[in-house]
Amino acid sequence: MFSSAGDILRCERARLDPERDFSSAGDILRCERARLDPERDFSSAGDILRCERARLDPERVFSSADEVVLKFEDGRVRARNVLYDTLPVVVHGNGPTKLQINYLGNYIPNIWTFETGCTACNEGLLPLEGLQESEYPLVLIGIFIQKPTPFVTVFFERFLKLQYPKNRLKLFIHNQEAHHESQVSLFLKDYGSLYQDVRVSGPEEEMDTAASRNLAIDVCRKDEGCDYFFTLDIEVVLKNENTLKILIEQNLPFVAPMITRAGRLWSNFWGALSAEGYYARSEDYVDIVQGRRVGVWNVPYVSSVYLLKASLLRSELTDFDLFNSDILDPDMAFCHNIRKQGVFMFVTNMQTFGRIVSTETYQTSHLHNDLWQIFENPVDWQERYIHENYTYIMSDKLIETPCPDVYWFPIFSDVACDHIVEEMEHFGKWSGGGNTDVRIQGGYENVPTIDIHMNQINFEKEWHKFLLEYIAPITEKMYPGYYTKCATPLNFVVRYKPDEQPLLAPHHDASTFTVNIALNSKEVDYQGGGCRFLRYDCSIEATRKGWTLMHPGRLTHYHEGLPTTGGVRYIAVSFVDP
């Protein structure tokens, strides 16, 4: 087998940084000498493997790619020919089989084993620690908005937290969607001056995906001061604030952080290609995505977020039309052209970096469309709209009992409250507050309010999902022995105003239990208000924005809405299990 611990990673790091010391075992020196041989092309993974110290053996294996697999042994891994049941010393690939060589090179010779993990991932790094801000590499970041995407505002909020000197960053923002123009403009208005330079192309330029990406890369290629190009698509949720530093420190010509879609095996890389050049699942794909194998992996395809050395753009990747193809999508065309030039694409899962939001069901017909993403992007929805202290409730650390069998706990973030109120006011069709109400069964409301029902804004399914996910567990905890599926014929937002409807007369709710969520703040947005339970002579007057009162609806908890004396008060109400 190959006796050197050197690997493709070291060869790649040395190839574009010849002044750096990679003299371990002399392996990189041999790689560099091989590359200078005018008679041979040592740009492929197979050639790099051959330029390692391999003991010559008369047995060479000329087999199809699927006949050579990995054989994991105690503390080491070898190539195995399953057709002949042999352990070849030399593995050579031509044409498309070179991708299989790249795959094998992720493991052999002893690059990754179950016992040691990755043995070479921390070699040849480029530490940034200790550098002055002015000494940091200059990075051009390309941000691409190609379709209507949820949580764009959150993307820019998170982008601001990226741990990298902003005066060493240039931005190229391409937005194809008129729907997102206001969010881009607001970000640039408030924070654009923090960056060394900003270039924006909007939907009015009618530039397609391939053209915008080609242009962004070319801007870096032609800028002598540009050291790196960092692609960041708008659907990327970059949770690790040190991502850019981590990728630069990997010191590879092309490296991407592994990100996945929450709860799914979908990721931003492919472990293998089919014969037609499309997705194929490699043997190790699931283990890499689920974190059972951790390392830096040579792969045939990446997308969404990746870092390129600018020196690579000025050497191997000088073609302007990297993203163009008559038959392939731009991202596939790009990776095809990268592979054609013999450039390795690496993806790292050495740390957790983030995830990708789904754009499949995103609708743009509402004021705050992200509210409707509880099904498609539940993790992002929770981070945006559920109170940051919600999880403490289940450990009894944050729940109050202001009145008998009345529980008070945080449920919504301020953003959720604001968005629900604004969505209702944007819809604008408030009821008249009379007993006659054609929206409900029977057409008569005994205790009318001025309100808008959730089904009027097509939010009924999403609201029911919210109740099941976040209210039902608390109900079952606080009312032992009671289990609910949150059947809710009435879900609505009530508006109280002194000159409209300031209060609500004493009544029982048509429910087993009621959820009553305060959507704005007393003494800030309104004065007065609150709820009084008459049987217990117990009042909650200082309601808290985003907190819910949960109480029985019938028989015991006869209650009234106290007068709102100033401003406008909003509450969200659900009658659960009538």
Residue ranges and their predicted role:
Residues S134, F155-R168, D190:
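Short, acidic, metal-binding catalytic loop of nucleotide-sugar glycosyltransferases
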Residues H464, L468-P578:
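Catalytic core of non-heme Fe(II) oxygenases with the double-stranded beta-helix
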Residues E224-K239:
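Short beta-strand-to-loop acidic/aromatic patch adjacent to the donor-nucleotide binding site
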Residues D396-T484:
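Non-heme Fe(II)/2-oxoglutarate
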Residues P148-Q163, H180-V184:
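Short, well-formed alpha-helical segments that are part of the catalytic scaffolds
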Residues M1-G6, R10-C11, E19, A25-R30, ...:
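Conserved catalytic core of nucleotide-sugar-dependent glycosyltransferases
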Residues E177-D227:
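Active-site-proximal specificity loops/subdomain of glycosyltransferases
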Residues S4, D47-P137, V294-V305, A310-V415:
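C-terminal catalytic/acceptor-binding lobe
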